[in-house]
């Protein structure tokens, strides 16, 4: 049973995020994983790592995830009853078990650690990989840096298709950092940053000593505010880390012309309540 809406909203407004919220049943999770596996076979992992953008308009099963009642229960507790789905994307960090771009093609559900020397060797490899500048990671950033919006907050969901742990690059957040407003973002000096604009918040502005890891079991979700400072490390495990990222806004939000944040919104969907404002074109329902 979910906490009362008032409790959800209070924690979210104070901390800027919620984590470990159970959404999918065992069967729903298996169905979603099977459907995603079909896309991997069709398009290949290089494509499915980051290029499945706004496919909620193409695949019914993806739209069902974005409109899942338990998910929307949390979203509406934070944003109110009138909510738009703004944008969606699958993001996958595939396992990299050697330096370079080679990927493990084995069973993605298998935990590679074993007792004895196997565990020690794997952890040594993990240490080396975290210092490899080429491995995919997500730098410290705020989502709102890339969204030309005003009139309401952006809420981001990570719905986990795989377990998300420290060793495969789980989300890290700075609690309460959403209260500091927009921070400067500069071009990243490190290679491997998955952010398409390759920016990051300068390290001296990030209170990394306050960072909190947000591990998830497959079928759970985390949600965070568009101004929350967050990041994720490379996947140094032998397991995939895949999730469905969904952005929601209250219907009162509206796009703005900002040359630093150019953005179009061609895939908006009314997922709860009614839209009294009609700020976005081509809204689906």
Where do the PLM segments sit?
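Residues that flank catalytic or metal-binding motifs in active/ligand-binding sites
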Residues: 58, 86, 153, 167-169, ...
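Double-stranded beta-helix
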Residues: 10, 117-121, 164-229, 233, ...
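A generic structural micro-feature
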Residues: 136, 149-153, 236-240
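Short, conserved beta-strand element in jelly-roll/cupin
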Residues: 141, 148-166, 215-218, 223, ...
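Non-heme Fe(II)-dependent double-stranded beta-helix
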Residues: 1-140, 145-148, 185-186, 259-261, ...
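Non-heme Fe(II)/2-oxoglutarate
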Residues: 42, 183, 221-223, 227-285
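Active-site region of the double-stranded beta-helix
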Residues: 81, 133, 144, 149, ...
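Phosphate/oxyanion-binding loops and surfaces in catalytic or ligand/nucleic-acid-binding neighborhoods
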Residues: 39-42, 81, 164, 180, ...
